[in-house]
């Protein structure tokens, strides 16, 4: 039994759910999300709660059971409240700015890095070294954040690079004479 999978998903007010076999469409005040699931999973709606149940007892189906429930729960949270990620840029001369539909990163390379911003993600920049990402889809938000971080991951000696707001970077000692 999956401890995560057997929990029902409460549906808050203002969120509408559409079920079509293994396709789930969820719409709310922040937007609309849809996802098609594979595997032997049954998704049902009863008394303002979504239930996810496995149709087989093998290991792969049980693994997908909890995963599917978590994805649907994140979709409900996303269309109701949305998700927010905060990234910090550390380093002398490291900064970012939004130009149109591109995020322009200046990270001590010979060229500036331009990353296209997906249409369903909003970017706020209170300072040149802080990037706040907002969106309804937690998976796409995390993917976009990892693309940004991959441009200059934090290094352990001086701590320069792009990292999540509260991410701990283990520091190393430099060379000793």
Curated annotation (Swiss-Prot):
GO molecular function: rRNA binding; structural constituent of ribosome
GO cellular component: a single term: ribonucleoprotein complex
Name recorded for this polypeptide: Large ribosomal subunit protein uL6
GO biological process, one term: cytoplasmic translation
Species in which this protein is naturally found: Rickettsia peacockii (strain Rustic)
PROSITE patterns per the UniProt record, alphabetical: RIBOSOMAL_L6_1
Family assignment from sequence similarity: Belongs to the universal ribosomal protein uL6 family.
General function of this protein: This protein binds to the 23S rRNA, and is important in its secondary structure. It is located near the subunit interface in the base of the L7/L12 stalk, and near the tRNA binding site of the peptidyltransferase center.
InterPro entries per record: Ribosomal_uL6-like, Ribosomal_uL6-like_a/b-dom_sf, Ribosomal_uL6_a/b-dom, Ribosomal_uL6_bac-type, Ribosomal_uL6_CS
Pfam families in alphabetical order: Ribosomal_L6
Protein's gene: rplF
Key words of the record: Ribonucleoprotein, Ribosomal protein, RNA-binding, rRNA-binding
Assembly, per entry: Part of the 50S ribosomal subunit.
């Amino acid at each position: 039994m999956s401890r995560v999978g057997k929990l029902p998903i409460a549906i808050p007010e203002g969120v509408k759910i559409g079920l079509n076999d293994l396709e789930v469409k969820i719409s709310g005040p922040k937007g609309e999300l849809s996802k098609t699931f594979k595997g032997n999973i049954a998704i049902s709606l009863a008394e303002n709660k979504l239930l996810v149940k496995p149709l087989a007892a093998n290991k792969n189906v049980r693994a997908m059971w909890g995963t599917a429930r978590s994805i649907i729960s994140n979709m409900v949270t996303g269309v109701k409240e949305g998700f927010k990620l905060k990234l910090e840029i550390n380093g002398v001369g490291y900064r970012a700015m939004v130009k149109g539909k591109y995020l322009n990163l200046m990270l001590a390379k010979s060229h500036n890095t331009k990353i296209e911003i997906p249409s369903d993600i909003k970017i706020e920049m209170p300072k040149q070294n802080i990037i706040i990402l907002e969106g309804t889809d937690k998976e796409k938000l995390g993917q976009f954040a990892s693309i940004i971080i991959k441009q200059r991951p934090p290094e352990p000696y001086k701590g320069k690079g792009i990292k999540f707001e509260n991410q701990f970077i283990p520091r190393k000692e430099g060379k000793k004479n």
